[in-house]
Amino acid sequence: MTENPITKYIGNFIDELSLAGVTEAVICPGSRSTPLAILAASHPDINVHIHVDERSAAFFAMGMAKAMRKPVALICTSGTAAANFYPAVIEAHYSRIPLMILTADRPHELREVGAPQAIDQQFLFGNFVKFFTDSALPDSHPDMLAYIRSLAARAAGEAKKAPRGPVHINFPLREPLMPNLEDEPFQRLRSGSHVTVESGRFRADRHELVALSALIKETEKGVIVCGELQDDDAKEHIVALSQAAEYPILADPLSNLRNGTHSKETIIDAYDSLLKEEQLKRELMPELVIRFGAMPVSKPLFQLLKQNPSIRQIVVDPDGGWRDPTQLSAHMLHCTEEEIAVLADSAVNSENRTGNWLEKWRFANSRFRALLRNLEAEDLTFEGNIYRNLQHLIPDNSSVFVGNSMPIRDADTFFENQERTFRIFANRGANGIDGVVSTALGIYAATKEPVTLVIGDLSFYHDLNGLLVSKTLDIPLTVVLVNNDGGGIFSFLPQSAEERYFELLFGTPTGLEFEHAAKLYGGRYICPESSAHFADAYLSSVNRRGLDIIEVKTKRDDRVEQHRRMLDSALHEIRKEWPF
């Protein structure tokens, strides 16, 4: 029998991926991708996850890679299958998430000739991938096996190299497609990796760091702004700098600085609300801002930075990117957070510090939180109360995935500092409302710890297909569904003033009964009517297997007025009590 070159060619590729640290593969069923799927599934060091919907599968893989911070392989057949990966590829690009996209394709002689299920897959994802190549046709010659191993190592290295991101390899494959597993598909050309790819991170010039240290010494009114971070280790360095410089940290919920066992003495969790009040904004106006991580969710913070060019902004990015939507940053420092933290010991000049600056922020923050705690939390029709109740129930060592639009903004407003050790995630690269369910399920597949998904009704509808893997892969998920029957965020925007067209074009109520979704995917459904009922339902869910949908029905018409009344009341009291 003639040897099929596909076996050793694809087998060597898959084996080299495993040596490069790829341990997980998400596979979408298809014929042309048969060798990729079978050889990934048969490799002893790769776990496979089967997902029949390509769009959901891509977000699922991205969720795994997001939690693990290492590449996950994503495999599909030829044709429009790969096009369904596109939204997740875009999100992975902007969120700096490493993905290995492996698409099967027709061989060259069947391209652009009207062959079935054949589209142009060259550079399909454009500039949203860090690396693309159309692999050579399978060949078992030793030179070609060395080539395909080198390609696997290179692609995995590119995905992991700063800034992390997706890569795409397209495989033209001729029939017969079935590999011969008796043919030693993973036989190595040499012991260990064929080639090891090592990449470091950027380091700052020593003179730049000395200049920054001097700037911190001479500037009392400084703040540290912290968005979503690429690595958890960065948190301790940022906290150390904050304490030494006596600068408050304006911590986005995705920084995960609000939760954890580290010191919270300098962490401000209510800055988004505080900066909405003009008098407080004047009192808390910084002269220096040091930014770490992605840009925070907060619009008032962005407006403060954008509208006050006299504020000196320094952006620290260890991945060498350009995260400055204000276009006003004075310095872009491409170095690690640890390098900045070495400034901590020399940053303080106590003679120039009055103590009032940090105390102003801490006073405003603590009073805002105290005033909010005194407000009635029983009425679940006010969406803020969902978050106020939920934050005290989330189990340690679990994950919370927060949907875009209103959920992430409400989490920013209502999630406060606490000693709990859960992690908060969201898809804030492109800020889309698609693929959120699947990303959350991918987080569980990577961590094997409880996952709570907080999501709005439109975003949930967008990715209902994703719930299937909760059933087929036995993935538990607690969904807190905040249902205001439409696009709640638009009620806060100028579009809400145009009553004739608001509901038609922006409110877009669907009237869906999500209890049927729970039945369709084998889950449990409950619609609590009180905070106590909500707590019971939630705690029961996170302590058992399976899918639970906890739907909280809220009133979109009332929420804007309730939200503003709550904020105005709290901010008014802070102004009255202001002691500085």
Curated annotation (Swiss-Prot):
Record SUPFAM superfamilies: DHS-like NAD/FAD-binding domain, Thiamin diphosphate-binding fold (THDP-binding)
Kindly list the GO molecular function terms attached to this UniProt entry: 2-succinyl-5-enolpyruvyl-6-hydroxy-3-cyclohexene-1-carboxylic-acid synthase activity; magnesium ion binding; manganese ion binding; thiamine pyrophosphate binding
Which keywords does this Swiss-Prot/TrEMBL entry list?
A: Magnesium, Manganese, Menaquinone biosynthesis, Metal-binding, Thiamine pyrophosphate, Transferase
Q: Which reaction does it catalyse?
A: isochorismate + 2-oxoglutarate + H(+) = 5-enolpyruvoyl-6-hydroxy-2-succinyl-cyclohex-3-ene-1-carboxylate + CO2
What note does UniProt attach to the cofactor annotation? Binds 1 thiamine pyrophosphate per subunit.
This protein's name: 2-succinyl-5-enolpyruvyl-6-hydroxy-3-cyclohexene-1-carboxylate synthase
Organism superkingdom:
Bacteria
Q: What does this protein do?
A: Catalyzes the thiamine diphosphate-dependent decarboxylation of 2-oxoglutarate and the subsequent addition of the resulting succinic semialdehyde-thiamine pyrophosphate anion to isochorismate to yield 2-succinyl-5-enolpyruvyl-6-hydroxy-3-cyclohexene-1-carboxylate (SEPHCHC).
The broad enzyme category this protein falls into is transferase
Pathway participation: Quinol/quinone metabolism; 1,4-dihydroxy-2-naphthoate biosynthesis; 1,4-dihydroxy-2-naphthoate from chorismate: step 2/7; Quinol/quinone metabolism; menaquinone biosynthesis
NCBIfam families per UniProt: menD (TIGR00173)
CDD domains recorded? TPP_PYR_MenD, TPP_SHCHC_synthase
